[in-house]
Amino acid sequence: MGLLSALKDFKVHNMSLKTLFKTLKKQIKYQKKIIQDNQRVKRIKRKDKIKVGFFVLHHSVWKSDPVFKAMLEDDYFEPFIFICPVNNIEDNQAIEDIKTNVSFFEKKGYPVVSSYDENSSNWVDIDSLGIDLIFFSNPHKLTKKEYYAKAYSKYLSVYIPYAHQVSKYNNYKSQYNQDFHNMMWAIYAPHFDDMDIFKEYAIQKGKNVIVTGYPSMEPLLEDNQPNESPWKQQENTKRKVIFAPHHTIDTPELPYSTFIKFSDVIKELSEKHKDDIQWAFKPHPLLKEKLYHHTDWGKEKTDEYYDYWKNSQHCQLEEGDYYDLFKSSDAMIHDSGSFLAEYLYVKKPVLYLSLSEDIRNYQNAFGNKAYDCCTKGHSEKDINQFISEVIDGTAKVDNTFLENDILVHFADKTPTQKIISHIKEKLMDSPN
């Protein structure tokens, strides 16, 4: 018995030594990056103007628009969009997707560069672009290493999360403690709970984190009137409801999705209430591809489902910008991650779908504060009741989260102003 106990103690001790060695190795790596970044800052300070590349995977998750616009109007910055390919799809499809995304930003009048050079049929070497600072919006290995790890290792890099940081999974490693996070020159966090998590779980302990608030949401607070209506014209006035399902149909470590259970229910309800409600189907960009490979769905069934929302007179499919959609809507039904916080900015009724109350275990403190202000939906009965309340105007709205956890970040300066100020303070020789 004593021998077994000794062996167990040795194993635990040995494992802890391995963990310690691994952590020390990473700390040395991160400290080296800090030293290199300090040298980069010194070089950049000699410049009157800096070139800033915003690395983007898809326009649907473009969340740095206010910051980009501010840089366009500031003589110190020369910003441009750099469209990266997405991994795990054929090159031909990746190139077509890049073209679509380039077109999106060109229509906005933004300077944009494709990562694929059609003239040479080669991927662009970012060293040829003269970049001083890179903005990332996704911490995961979703693109070529040249536009991910090699880029943030070699260039001064900052990170604005593409989501509002409401989730909790994998002991926070994926969201807060990858090499990516620890090697950023600066991380612009959307809320104070984010800073607490970085301090506890990241090897850098939040030393490179600045809490600014979430710049992506500025348009929702600046003006609550839509620039133009994104909704299909109807014969009579109807309530406008958004149905926004998440993509995690195959992700047990983050079981947000209720789509498999409720997709047909909500489709049937949209038919039942078509004289009273017009619907916007706003799926997560990754949902369709996952449904294509789902054993109970597949491409044909998925396309038919999407086409229903796209082509029905009382429905529409929304796959891009959603600011005007949020502003002009009357309510939302969803099981999303970031939308859990984002839709609460517009002070409208929201039904959050989940399969059980255990969902709280997959949200951080910030996410749970947002969740507490939502109407909860666990069944078809709950969905029916919410829809009835939306139609008759009795659906409840709770603004506690907005007032306590959001508006504080917009009190004196906007998140964009804080980000611009931080960069200029650190990189300009004599900032104004």
Model-identified regions with their sequence ranges:
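Membrane-proximal basic amphipathic "stem/tether" segments
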Residues: M1-D48
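A nucleotide-sugar donor-handling region in carbohydrate enzymes
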Residues: T19-D37, P161, S174-S257
